[in-house]
Structures are given as C-alpha cells and as structure tokens.
Amino acid sequence: MSIDKLHKKLIKNKCTISVAESCTGGLLSSKLTKLSGSSKYFKMGLITYSNTAKINILQINKKIIYKYGAVSSECCRLMVKNLSKISKSKINLSITGIAGPNGGTKEKPVGLVYIGVKKGNKILIIKNLFGKKKRTFIQNNT
C-alpha cells in the first residue's frame, strides 16, 4: 500500500499510529509524516538505534537483549508491546535489523529485519531476509 493510500485510510478511520525504529533510523517516521495532515494520525516516532535506547526508552529488559540480541523476534515483540503502552496508538510498529554493510553474522546476516505490528491485543512479528543488499535498499524496503 502506498503512503498516499495509507494516509487517506488512517484519516478516514480516525486511526493513530506510532513507530519505534532501529535500523531504519527514522525513515519510516519520515515517510509517514511527509503528507500534510499526518498529525491527525501520527502520534510518535522513536529512534531506538542503540541497545541503551531500547533499554532506557522502550524499557526492554537488558537480559532479553543479552540473551537473544537486539535483532531478534523477542526484542522486536517487546519493542512494539512497550511502544503501545507509551503511545496509546491504535496501531504500533517496531523495526529492528541489520542494514549493513557490516555487522552481520552467519546466524544474523546483513539484511535480516524484524517488523513488529500491534493492533489491539494482537502482535504480529514479520521476519524479513533482504540478503546482502545495499544499506539504502534494506532501509527503504523495510
């Protein structure tokens, strides 16, 4: 769905949205707010790039990060869950991943991105493997 269509749909349905981003560094927030009138639905965008930001702002237990890593479905789930407590938005999104070109491992390669979506009491975690593409490709396609 294009940003234009999403923009119209969110306004029509009086739906609010918030995001917590890591590897996209605010890119999704920027796209969601590019159109006039986005203040009707966009409540907040948090860039929690570092582990410290995830721990201090989103209240992710550091034991989760040390056990599973910041790039994990577990961390992504807590990011979106805790964001929803802060934002009170109807829809909450979280993004954590490895945009590269460095930082990947065999278990967690460059291009691995988790996206969390929370609406109501339902949470969906989507695992994406973009492959070893350019950083901008991974960020723009997340």
Residue positions per predicted region:
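Short alpha-helical segments enriched in small residues
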Residues: M1-T142
